[in-house]
Amino acid sequence: MTSEPTTFLFSGYARLPQDVSHQAMYKRVGVVLEVDEAGVVVACSTTLMMASADGFFQRLLVGRNVLAERRAIEALVRYRYRGHSQGALVSALHKIFEAVDQSPLATGEPAGPAPGATAPNGGAGGAETHG
């Protein structure tokens, strides 16, 4: 039996500056955050080519709250992440924050089972909405 995740996955992308080594190949940087129901980042990854840069960015974000600490997250990235991709990473984070604002985390909808999911007792997991 597979358990349903209790987290949300958000992604954001932004253009890389011209002076980044892998800009010619990829043009954009991607950021993906896995966030729990309280808004806390539990996992993070980027499309940055260097493992040390990706790992550093992960350490900056894991444990931070995307609902309550947005300004602090951005300030931390701007202060600590001194690589050429800094601006693109911040832009990608802004796109993630916009996606969070449209999710059950920010809209106040219950974050229970996904619409149409089967509840453990075999019943419907929630009302399905279309629109």
Predicted regions and their residues:
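Active-site- and interface-proximal helix/loop "cap" or "latch" segments in soluble metabolic
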Residues: D19-G131
